[in-house]
Amino acid sequence: METGFPAIMYPGSFIGGWGEEYLSWEGPGLPDFVFQQQPVESEAMHCSNPKSGVVLATVARGPDACQILTRAPLGQDPPQRTVLGLLTANGQYRRTCGQGITRIRCYSGSENAFPPAGKKALPDCGVQEPPKQGFDIYMDELEQGDRDSCSVREGMAFEDVYEVDTGTLKSDLHFLLDFNTVSPMLVDSSLLSQSEDISSLGTDVINVTEYAEEIYQYLREAEIRHRPKAHYMKKQPDITEGMRTILVDWLVEVGEEYKLRAETLYLAVNFLDRFLSCMSVLRGKLQLVGTAAMLLASKYEEIYPPEVDEFVYITDDTYTKRQLLKMEHLLLKVLAFDLTVPTTNQFLLQYLRRQGVCVRTENLAKYVAELSLLEADPFLKYLPSLIAAAAFCLANYTVNKHFWPETLAAFTGYSLSEIVPCLSELHKAYLDIPHRPQQAIREKYKASKYLCVSLMEPPAVLLLQ
């Protein structure tokens, strides 16, 4: 190795120690397959990608093994892609602002609105036949509500037949295509005037306010059917609350790297918690579960989700494409393909539409709501609708010195006294976040598009009387 290069460890993706023995699992209706941890090849140091000045150093196995991410100050062009943070049992080390490191947006369009163009797929890694499975399952006695939620829903037959006015369709098509008599500019201006007429109707057409209460009641019923177990971590033999916090913080970075929607993050965390509620996972595979949950959520929510190779890359190829796809398959099996779940984000958006607030209050409510994702305890014991109400109250009090308006109390059925326990927990998380090592959410909301709401001083106390 050249002496001009410092030893640099590219980020790996293991949470915890090395060389764990994986538990096997066999369950009814689930595939009998295994996953294999990628071993460290040697203790020697390698030079990787000398043009970018990055050195890949491997370390010996051991309980005290740790990895550090830095960059050599050689002045060469930065690498074309950015590998996200390293997950370990002791903490997360990642590239930070202020070290002269530029985060590179790879391939995705603005707000994930355009399909990737000119992408080069990463080469598939060879997969060896793994010996044992990395999961163990425990089955709790299902309650009657759980049995009902897992039953197969029969499809509904559409008995109503709607007639199509073909004359109108033909006239519209003739209007758009008859360029001999109408110039393209006139067509564009006509379409523009039509869109202005539609927009003049306001947001009631889109928000279907006449059905808002029915939609809300349906979501309130659905959130009970799809909530994870509040204290599932007590049954996990090899992972802890801290490891889950590190994983969720990393998922926030993944969402920012690929400019995914906020709802995608909430769905991924819901899938993760529901999976861990009935499956025990070893720490070496926890990030694989989280990555598969994010992949599945992005497929469900995004117009142009990142490709599988992108998710393999962000784990620094710790897991192969085949492993990730198999984990996605297992995740769908465990979730019974039930992916349409109400989240805190959905309820919060309903509250914000129902009760108009300023943009700063809206962004602050979204910020404190995302903070609830970091901690399974205590927030999993609260329903998403209640967490959203607490986030609204906390943001409204911070900016406007008011808590819970009467309009939302009537709409949601929640009184302020019912919100107070969750509000107190959320306020505590709001006060503690500047001192925590997991800063991805706080860094996200430091951006100007969110009006830098994470830099606002939280209220020291909540005057609830």
From Swiss-Prot:
Domain of life, per lineage: Eukaryota
Pfam families in the cross-refs: Cyclin_C, Cyclin_N, Cyclin_N2
Keywords: Cell cycle, Cell division, Cyclin, Mitosis, Nucleus, Ubl conjugation
UniProt entry tagged with the keyword DNA-binding: no
InterPro entries attached to this UniProt entry: Cyclin, Cyclin-A_N, Cyclin-like_dom, Cyclin-like_sf, Cyclin_C-dom, Cyclin_N, Cyclins_cyclin-box
Nucleotidyltransferase is among the record's keywords: no
Tissues expressing this chain: Very high levels in testis and very low levels in brain. Also found in myeloid leukemia cell lines.
Post-translational modification: Polyubiquitinated via 'Lys-11'-linked ubiquitin by the anaphase-promoting complex (APC/C), leading to its degradation by the proteasome. Deubiquitinated and stabilized by USP37 enables entry into S phase. Ubiquitinated during the G1 phase by the SCF(FBXO31) complex, leading to its proteasomal degradation.
Cited function: May be involved in the control of the cell cycle at the G1/S (start) and G2/M (mitosis) transitions. May primarily function in the control of the germline meiotic cell cycle and additionally in the control of mitotic cell cycle in some somatic cells.
PANTHER family associated with the record: CYCLINS (PTHR10177)
The protein's assembly and partners: Interacts with the CDK2 and the CDC2 protein kinases to form a serine/threonine kinase holoenzyme complex. The cyclin subunit imparts substrate specificity to the complex. Does not bind CDK4 and CDK5 (in vitro). The cyclin A1-CDK2 complex interacts with transcription factor E2F-1 and RB proteins. Found in a complex with CDK2, CABLES1 and CCNE1. Interacts with INCA1. Interacts with KLHDC9.
Name of this protein: Cyclin-A1
Native species: Homo sapiens
Encoding gene per record: CCNA1
